[in-house]
Structure formats: C-alpha cells, structure tokens
Amino acid sequence: MEESPREAWAQFPAWSSSRKARTGPSLASVLNDLPSAATLRYRGPGVLPWGTLDENDDEGRSLQAFAETAQMESQPSRELPWPMQARRAHRKSQAREQVASGSESRAAYWTQQLSRTKGKMKEGFQTIQPWAWTLKKIGGQFGAGTESYFSLLRFLLFLNLGASVIEVCMKLIPTWLEGAPPGPPGPNISSPCGSYIPHTQGLVTFPTQLFNLLSGEGYLEWSPLFYGFYPPRSNLAITYLCSVFAIGLIYLLFILHRSVSGLKETLLAESDVLTSYSHRVFSAWNFGLCGDMHVRLRQRIILYELQVDLEEAAVRRRATEQTLGQRVKVWSMRALLNLLVLALLGAAFYGIYWATEYTVTLQETPVVQQTPLLKLLVNYLPSIFISVFNFVLPPAFTFIASLEGYTHSRQIVLILLRTVFLRLASLVFLLFSLWNQITCGGNMEAEECKACGYNYKEIPCWETRLGQEMYKLVLFDLLMGLLVTLLIQFPRKILCGLCPGALGRLSGTLEFQVPDEVLGLIYAQTVVWVGSFFCPLLPLINTAKFLILFWLKKITLFSIYSPASRTFRASTANFFFPLVLLVGLAISAVPVLYSIFLIPPSKLCGPFQGKLSIWAQIPESIESLPQTAQNFLYFLGTQAFTVPLLIVSSILMMYTVALANCYGRLISELKRQIETEVQNKVFLAQRAVALSSRNGVS
C-alpha cells in the first residue's frame, strides 16, 4: 500500500526534533521581522500566512497543513522543498488525482508531448552537428570567443552550401534542360551597342592559363561561372531572378534566427541583477559529463568565463574611482585616438579609389600588355590595396583600442565596428568606382552611355565585369590567408620556439585575434552576396574556400597559437557577429537591387538582353499567365491589399510591443523579489549569528 505525503514526512524525525530543540524567539516572530514581511504580506495561494504557526501547535497538525497546502500547488514535485520520499508520494498522489478527475485535457497532453519531442530533436541535432567535438575542444582550450569564430565559420559554410544547391537547381539545370546554350558571340555580330568578343583562347601558355584562372578571363569568361554565359530565354530569366530573392530571404531568416538566440544570451549576461559569479559556480557545471577530458574542458570553459567577469569588474571598479581630472584626460585621449582612426580610414579609402580608377588606364599601357606578371598585378591592383589595408589597419585598431581604457568586451566591440567599417566601406568604394565606370559617373547623357544606358565601349558586358571583380576578391582573400599562414605565422612560431633569447621575445607569442578573423569572414561573405548575381557559382567557390579555411585555422590554432591572455564574453560574439552579418547583407543588397531596377542590362550577353531593366522581365512574364492569375498578382500591388496589410501589421506590432512591456514589468517584479529574498537570507544569517553568540555566552 502506497504511503501518503503526510506519512512520508513522519519518517523524518529530524524535521520535528529540530523544532523542539530550537531556543530563542519563535519562528513566527522571526518571519514577521523579515524585510519582505513589510511589503509582501500575501504570499499567494497555497502558502500559509506568516505568524499562524506557534511552537506549541500540534506537530502532526502542522505537518498535515503543510502537506495539504503543497498538494494544492500546481508546481512540479521536484520544486517542492521536501525530502525525496515525500516528493515521490506527492507526485503519485497528483497522478492518481489527474487520472480520476480527468483534469488534464487532450490539448495540454499533446502540447506537452510536442515540447518534449522538440527538445529531444534539438538535443539530437546538436549531437550530430559536424565538428561539434572540435568546437567544444576549442572552447575549452582557447575560450568561448575563439569557439564563436569557428561556430560562425561553420554556420556560413552551410549557408553557402545551401545557396549553391539553389543556384545549381535554378540557374544551371534550367540552362541545359532547354538545350545546349549558344556559344560566344562572333566578331561579325555587332549592334548599336558595339560588339562583345570574349577571349576564349584555345591552347595557350601556362602563364596565360594561370592568368585566366586567377582573373576570370579567357576560357572562364564564357563559362557557367559568369552572368554572360546564360542565354536569353524567358523561363531561365525568371528562375535566374527568383533565385536571387529566394537566396536572400533564406540568408535573412537564418541570420535573424541566430541573432535573436544570441540576443537572449547577451541580455542575460549583461544583466546586473543576477550575479554572474553565482551563476557560474552553482549552475554552470554539467553533471552528465563522462571522461577526464570532458571534465577538464568544462573546467577550462568555466575558468575563462570567470576570468572575463573578474577582468571587467576590475576595469569598472577603476573607472568609478577616477577623479574629474582623470576622466577629462581619458576622454581627451579617446577623442584624439578617434581622430587618428578617421585619418587612417580616409587614407585607406582614397588608396582603394585611386587603384580602381587607374586600373583600366594602366592595363592599356604597352609595358603591361607585354608582361603577363605585370598585367596580373595590375588586374589585381584593387584587390591588393584592399587586402593590404585589411591586413595592416586591424592590428593598429587593436593597439588604439587598448589605449582608450574600456573594458575588454567594449574594446572588442570598438575593434569590430572600426574593422567592419574599414572592410565594408572599402568594398563600397570599389563598387562606387565600378559604378562610375559603368554609368559614366551617373550621367546617362554622356557620349559613351547615351546609346545604351551604360558605357558599352569600355565594358560591353558590365555584369560579367562585376562578377570578375568579386571573383578576384574571393580568390585573392584565400591566397592571402594561405600566404600569411605559411610565410609569416609558421616561421614566426618556429623562431619563437628556437630562440628563447631576445630574438624569440621580439617575435612574440601568437594569439588568435578573434575580431580580425571574424571580420575577415563577414567581409568574404559580403563579397559573395554582392557577386552571386553576376557570378552564380561564387557561393560554391566560397563553400570550398570556407572548408579549406576551417581546417587550416584549426591546424594553425592548435599548432601555432597560444590561449589568449585576455578573453571576452561569448554573449558578445553570439549577438554582435550576426548583427554585423546583417549589416553586410544590407550593404550587399544595395548594388544588387540597383542593378536589377535601374541599370539597363547588357545588350550582348546574359538572359536579360534587350530589356529596359532586369526587373522588366517580371511584368512581361505576368502578362503571359492566365487572366485570373494576372488579376491576383496585380491585386497584390494595389492599395486594396497593401492598406489592410499595413493595418494588420500595425495591430500585430502594437500587440507585440504591449506583450513585451508586460513581460518587462513581470521580469522587473521578479528581480525585485530576488533582491528581497537576498535581503531575507542576509537577515536570517545575522539573526542566526546573534542567537549563536547569545547561546555561547549563556
């Protein structure tokens, strides 16, 4: 026969004897003196009011009251402050009552089952994720910041893999399903917009072959790699254009999901109400770990997190102790350093603009035309300038941020902001220079652009030219990473290990610079977003590049780098990195949408030949649909649809804001209750010390 919760309580005489052996003030008087008693008299349903118990009350009656009270509560049995046997009896009693009364509805049952299934699927997905053990090992040895870099790299790798599948299904396959695409235009084909003759050489020398491979010219210029290869077919034009919006939407949704999940961790980590130290000490350990290696890795992760908290607390304490004169000195230093940062950025942008503007002029000189290596260098001149500035300025930004007196997490954010501005703005300046060449500086009445709407004399297929520039940026970024690793980092590590003296100290210890590495990923991904419309296979190339980069960085991390002397919060990485990715996605959308809606497509290449704009293909395709489908699609663009949609969206937004405000007030109330509970514990500890001292004296 099963025992009741009351009988289970009766098996623990220590709970009863402790009350009888207690001396001093009664429990009711102590509870009434608690700080929370002055503001929180009503404790909610199911909790006995304070002051109702007395020491002379019948013991069984009080235990029965507590048991009956707990049975009325809806909280799970594991949350009750009871012995284990009493909680088991209480859980069985609740189960019998639920079966007898049928209080658990079918909807609640399926909701519970769905939540359990979702949790199990999430755990299983995390278990089968590629390189999960590698990331865990990196986090344990080098900290959460370094782990976040590899996590972001894995995330971008799979996004590019998905985009590559969509590109192949919506561009390559439709091209070959409707027949073999035509060859390149011949020299006899001309139009009012000139002629376009891709240089598809046959047998060439090895230097020329290498030049074509690295520049995207020659046999690659008329290949599925670039926009100009795809023939002007209506079905292909629709799938080509729709793939751009489909891939962009997928990127946006996945990055937003990652940003929101990181925002929750950031808000919790940055909260000052809950002490980070107690959270790390009491709830950070995973009791399901098996094996010494897993235990040591978890210990290192907790150690790094505590180290970050202690470092930032020390910096904040020093900041609060500063005098007015010291604060003025600090702010003056920060102003001067920011002026220096602006000067460095201005010099970098001017160099990139100069390199892009004069590349065409230098390519036409006889010396460059006769020397293949010099021609390759001139062709890569904008990419070289961008890579040099991206290699030199981030360490300078790191040094400048260390002089500004911020916490390490704030320094990471500043370095990220400055570096992302450098990398993305340099790409913007490159695109602006190319736009200036394509559209004659925006002057459509100029002689070169008046006939066709673009500079057809210098750039007969401007989409392929843009794709080639993005292709060269992706390749050069990969080559720079390989060269820096093989020619700088490995020799530096060997020199540091073989020369323990002054020369070894001069070479220094290599530490993994997370901000610079992350911004390199975001810059590379932004280049791919810009160029994927003009170079459809660029996501596939970037997938292979990220795969090579993952293994290269993993090998160099464990063989060259040492754990960072200063770390930063994982919450900063989990939220800020996807946020910068969103900025890169927004920046990349501007040139792509501008090309689709405003610049006339090339007249001699690509699937949109002869159109006033690339977007003009959509209305023409709609007109070929049945009348019912046309009416429905045109209705989506009228005010009869957009105005109700705007009203419904506004109502949903207001509801979301109101719900967020309610949750905010609830969170504030819970925080106040936590503070009150802390005061209660302090008060009880003080009373216990006072009573112990009094009993010792007596």
Swiss-Prot record:
Subcellular location: Membrane
Spans within the Cytoplasmic topological domain: 176-235, 356-380, 433-469, 539, 600-639
Catalysed reactions, as listed in the record: chloride(in) = chloride(out)
Pfam family, one: TMC
Keywords recorded for this protein, A-Z: Ion channel, Ion transport, Membrane, Transmembrane, Transmembrane helix, Transport
Region of interest: Disordered: 1-25, 74-104
Transmembrane segments: 155-175, 236-256, 335-355, 381-401, 412-432, 470-490, 518-538, 540-560, 579-599, 640-660
InterPro entries, alphabetized: TMC, TMC_dom
Topology term for the membrane: Multi-pass membrane protein
Record function comment: Voltage-gated chloride channel involved in high-concentration salt taste sensation. Depolarization induced by high NaCl concentration may trigger the activation of TMC4-mediated chloride influx into taste bud cells, helping the return to resting potential. Also allows permeation of organic anions including gluconate, but their current amplitudes at positive potentials are less than that of chloride. Involved in pH and temperature-dependent modulation of salty taste.
Name of the molecule in the record: Voltage-gated chloride channel TMC4
